[in-house]
Curated annotation (Swiss-Prot):
GO terms for biological process: chloride transport. It is a multi-pass membrane protein. It comes from the Eukaryota. This is Chloride channel protein ClC-Kb. The keyword Disulfide bond does not apply. Residues 553-613, 630-689 form the CBS domain. PANTHER family: CHLORIDE CHANNEL PROTEIN 2, CHLORIDE CHANNEL PROTEIN CLC-KB. It comes from Xenopus laevis (African clawed frog). Belongs to the chloride channel (TC 2.A.49) family. Chloride binds at S122, F428. The gene is clcnkb. N-glycosylated on a single asparagine, probably Asn-365 or Asn-375. Pfam families: Voltage_CLC.
Length: 689
C-alpha cells in the first residue's frame, strides 16, 4: 500500500511528489478486527459504564494502603530493634528516639513541599472545597499524588511519637486517582469532559479512602455523605458502595495473603462479653461520657483553630514556615519526641506502643485498676508484650487513673501542635485514639465507684471499662468531625455491635455540643486557610429567610448591549477582569438575554479594530458588525430574583455548585451574587454589628 505526500513550495512555485510505501497487509481483516473491537468497547461501556474504573479505583487504593502499612511496619520494627540493641545506654537510646522521627518528619516536609506546596495536611478541607464547585489548581495532579504518598509514608514511620494518622491523606490520594481515572475514561470512551461524572467519581473516592484504611466500606460511604458533600445524590450510593467494598475486600485479603491474619477479621479485635455487655443503669454514665467528649471536643476545636491561625500570624513562626518548613517540622518533632522518650515522661504515655497497639490496648476487656491491685508485682517488660499491651499503661509511680489523665492532657496540646506541621498527615486516627483514652478513664472511674458492678433485678454485672473506651472513640472523633458515621466505623473496625445503642447515644450527645458551639475540624481549617468555601447556615435564628437577594447583591456590574461596537466592548473589558459579561437587549430595557465569554470579546476586539484608528489599507481587512452578530451569546439558564431569600440562594449555590448568579427584576438585570457576597451576608447575620 502506498501513500502520496505532496509538499508545496510557494516561493519557487514548485511541487514535489514523494511516494512513500507503507506495508499494511490484510486491510480487510484489519478493518474487520478494528470494527469488532470498537463494537466490543461500546458494548462494555454501555453495560458497565464507569463501574470498571470504580473497581480499579478500589483495587489500586487497597494496594497502596497495604504497601504503605507494610513499609511503615518494617520501619517501626527497625526503630524498635535499634532501641533494644542499644541496651542500657540512656544517652544513645535518647538520641535514637529523637533522631528517627526528626529525620523522617523533616524529610517528609522537605520532599513534599519541594514537589508541590499543596501536599501538606490531610487534604480533606481542599477536597470539600473542590466538591462544592470551586476549581483548585494542582490539588488533584499526579505530581501531588507522588509527593503525598512518599511524605505520608515517612510521617507514619515516625510512629505514635508524632501521633498522626492517614485517613485524611488517603481520601485525598483516592480523589487524585479518581480524577486520573476519570480523564482516562474520557479518552477511552470518547466522551466529552463531564463535570457531573467527575463529581461522582470524587464522592466515591472519599468512601474508598476510608474503607481502605479501616476495611470499613459502609462507614466509608456514610463519611463521604456527611463530611465531604453538602448535598448527596442517591445515585452515588451504588458507586460509593461498590468502589468502597472492592477496596475494603482487597485490603483485607492482602493481609491474609501476607499471613498477618488467618482469615478476614476485624482490624481491631475485642473480646467483650456479648451476652450481657452493659446494664441499663449504665446508660446514665454513657450519656455523661458523651457530654465529656463533646465539651473536650469543643475545647480542642477552638484551641486547634486558634493555634493554626496564630502560627500563621506570628512573625517568627510565619517567617520559618515561609523560608524553611523542614526546620519548623524538625523543631516540633524534637520537642514532642523528647517528651515522649520512654525513659522520661514517655513512660506515663505508653509511648512504646504504635497507634494500632494504643487503640487495641485501650479496648482491653480487663479492669486495669483491679488487675494491678490483685497483682502488685506486675512490672513492664523491657520489650513490648503483644499479649499484654495494657501493661504499658501501668507505672509504679502513677495509678492507672493518673496515667490516663496525664496521657489525655499531654496528647491534647501535643496533637494540636502536630496539626500545624506542613507535611502530609491525617488527623482522624489520633482523635479516635484520644477519644478511646477518655472513654477508658471514665470506664475505670465507674468501675472504681462500683467495684462489684451495678445491681439490676437482683443480678450484679461487672463494669467493662473497655466498652467505655469503645464508645469514647467514635463519640469524640464524631464530635470533632461533626459526623455520626464514626459510630458505624467502630462497629465495622472492631466487629463488635454489642454496645450499639450506647455508642449512638454518646455520638449524638457529643455532636450536639460541638455542632452548636464550634465548626468541625475540617470547616475550621477551611476558615483559617481562607479557602473559597460557603459557610453553612446552621440556625434559623439568624433570619436567613427574611433577607432578600436585593439586600446583599452587588449592583455594580458591567453589561454589554447586543448592538455594542468596538468602543463599548473595549471600555467594558478594560474596566474589569471578569471571565464573562452579561448581555442585555439594549441599554434602555436592560433585559438580560445571555452572557459572552471574555476570550470571545478579546477576539472581537482583534477582528473589529476601531475604524478611526485603522489606516486606509487596514480598513479593508476589518470585519464589520456588532457584538450580537459577531459573538456567540450563551443563554442564561439560571438567575436569581430580587425576592429570592438568602437561605434559598445559599441552598441553590450549594446544590448547583454555582460560582455566581445574575439577579433580575421583571427580566431586567439589576446585579449579581458571587460566593463572596453570599459569604459576607451569612457572616453579617451570624455576627451582627
Amino acid at each position: 500500500m502506498s501513500r502520496v505526500l505532496v509538499i508545496e513550495q510557494r516561493e519557487g512555485e514548485e511541487k514535489t511528489l514523494i511516494q512513500k510505501h507503507i506495508f499494511r497487509p490484510f486491510p480487510n481483516t484489519r478493518r474487520v478486527v478494528i470494527d469488532h473491537l470498537q463494537r466490543l468497547k461500546n458494548f462494555l461501556f454501555r453495560i458497565g459504564d464507569d463501574w470498571y474504573f470504580l473497581f480499579a479505583l478500589g483495587v489500586i487504593m487497597a494496594l497502596i494502603s497495604f504497601t504503605m502499612d507494610f513499609t511503615v511496619s518494617k520501619m517501626l520494627n527497625a526503630h524498635r530493634w535499634l532501641q533494644q540493641e542499644l541496651g542500657g545506654n540512656v544517652l544513645l537510646r535518647y538520641l535514637s528516639w529523637i533522631v528517627y522521627p526528626i529525620a523522617l518528619v523533616a524529610f517528609s516536609t522537605g520532599f513534599a513541599q519541594s514537589i508541590t506546596p499543596h501536599s501538606g495536611g490531610s487534604g480533606i478541607p481542599e477536597l470539600k472545597t473542590i466538591l462544592s464547585g470551586v476549581i483548585l489548581e494542582e490539588y488533584l495532579t499526579i505530581k501531588n499524588f507522588g509527593a503525598k504518598v512518599v511524605g505520608l509514608t515517612c510521617t507514619l514511620s515516625a510512629g505514635s511519637t508524632m501521633f498522626l494518622g492517614k485517613v485524611g491523606p488517603f481520601v485525598h490520594l483516592s480523589s487524585m486517582i479518581a480524577a486520573y481515572l476519570g480523564r482516562m475514561r474520557t479518552s477511552v470512551a470518547g466522551d466529552y469532559e463531564n463535570k457531573s461524572k467527575e463529581h461522582e467519581m470524587l464522592v466515591a473516592a472519599a468512601a474508598v479512602g476510608v474503607s481502605t484504611v479501616f476495611g470499613a466500606p459502609i462507614s466509608g460511604v456514610l463519611f463521604s455523605v456527611e463530611v465531604m458533600s453538602s448535598h448527596f445524590a442517591i445515585r452515588n450510593y451504588w458507586r460509593g458502595f461498590f468502589a468502597a467494598t472492592c477496596g475494603a475486600f482487597v485490603f483485607r485479603l492482602l493481609a491474609v495473603f501476607n499471613s498477618e491474619q488467618e482469615t478476614i477479621t476485624a482490624v481491631f479485635k475485642t473480646s467483650f462479653k456479648i451476652s450481657f455487655p452493659f446494664d441499663l443503669p449504665e446508660m446514665f454514665f454513657f450519656a455523661i461520657l458523651g457530654v465529656v467528649c463533646g465539651l473536650i471536643g469543643c475545647a480542642y476545636l477552638f484551641c486547634q483553630r486558634w493555634l493554626l491561625g496564630y502560627v500563621r500570624r506570628n512573625s517568627l513562626t510565619s517567617k520559618l514556615l515561609a523560608s524553611d518548613k523542614p526546620m519548623y517540622s524538625a523543631l516540633v518533632a524534637l520537642l514532642i519526641s523528647s517528651i515522649t522518650f520512654p525513659e522520661s515522661l514517655g513512660q506515663f504515655l505508653a509511648s512504646r506502643l504504635t497507634m494500632k497497639e494504643l487503640l487495641t490496648s485501650l479496648f482491653d476487656n480487663r479492669t486495669w485498676w483491679i488487675s494491678l491491685s490483685q497483682n502488685s508485682s506486675l512490672d513492664r517488660s523491657p520489650l513490648v508484650d503483644p499479649n499484654n499491651l495494657w501493661l504499658e499503661w501501668a507505672n509504679p509511680q502513677f495509678t492507672i487513673f493518673g496515667t490516663l489523665a496525664f496521657f489525655i492532657i499531654m496528647k491534647f496540646w501535643m496533637f494540636i501542635l502536630a496539626t500545624t506541621l506542613p507535611m502530609p498527615a491525617g488527623y482522624f486516627m489520633p482523635v479516635f485514639v484520644f477519644g478511646a483514652a477518655i472513654g477508658r478513664l471514665v470506664g475505670e472511674t465507674v468501675a472504681l465507684l462500683y467495684p462489684e458492678g451495678i445491681a439490676a433485678d437482683g443480678i450484679v454485672n461487672p463494669i467493662i471499662p473497655g466498652g467505655y473506651a469503645w464508645q469514647g472513640a467514635p463519640a469524640y472523633s464524631g464530635a470533632v468531625t461533626h459526623s455520626v458515621s464514626t459510630a458505624l466505623l467502630a462497629f465495622e473496625a472492631t466487629g463488635q455491635i454489642a454496645h450499639i445503642l450506647p455508642v449512638i447515644l454518646c455520638v449524638l450527645i457529643a455532636n450536639a455540643f460541638t455542632q452548636k458551639l464550634q465548626p468541625s475540624f475540617y470547616d475550621g481549617t477551611i476558615i483559617v486557610k481562607k479557602l473559597p468555601y460557603l459557610p453553612r447556615i446552621r440556625s434559623r435564628d439568624i433570619d436567613s429567610y427574611k433577607v432578600n437577594t436585593e439586600e446583599f447583591m452587588n449592583p455594580d456590574i458591567r453589561v454589554l448591549p447586543r448592538e455594542a461596537g468596538f468602543e463599548d466592548v473595549l471600555k467594558v473589558i478594560t474596566a474589569s477582569d471578569d471571565s464573562e459579561y452579561p448581555v442585555v437587549d439594549n441599554t434602555e430595557s436592560q433585559v438580560l438575554v445571555g452572557t459572552v465569554k471574555r476570550p470571545q470579546l478579546i477576539h472581537f476586539l482583534e477582528t473589529h479594530e476601531s475604524h478611526e484608528r485603522a489606516g486606509p489599507t487596514e480598513k479593508e481587512n476589518l470585519s464589520e458588525g456588532n457584538l450580537g452578530e459577531a459573538c456567540s451569546i450563551e443563554p442564561v439558564t439560571f438567575q436569581l430574583s430580587t425576592w429570592t431569600s438568602l437561605h434559598q440562594a445559599h441552598h441553590l449555590f450549594e446544590l448547583l455548585h454555582l460560582q455566581k448568579a445574575f439577579v433580575t427584576k421583571y427580566g431586567r438585570i439589576v446585579g449579581q451574587v458571587t460566593r463572596k457576597e453570599m459569604k459576607k451576608a451569612i457572616e453579617d447575620l451570624a455576627n451582627p454589628k
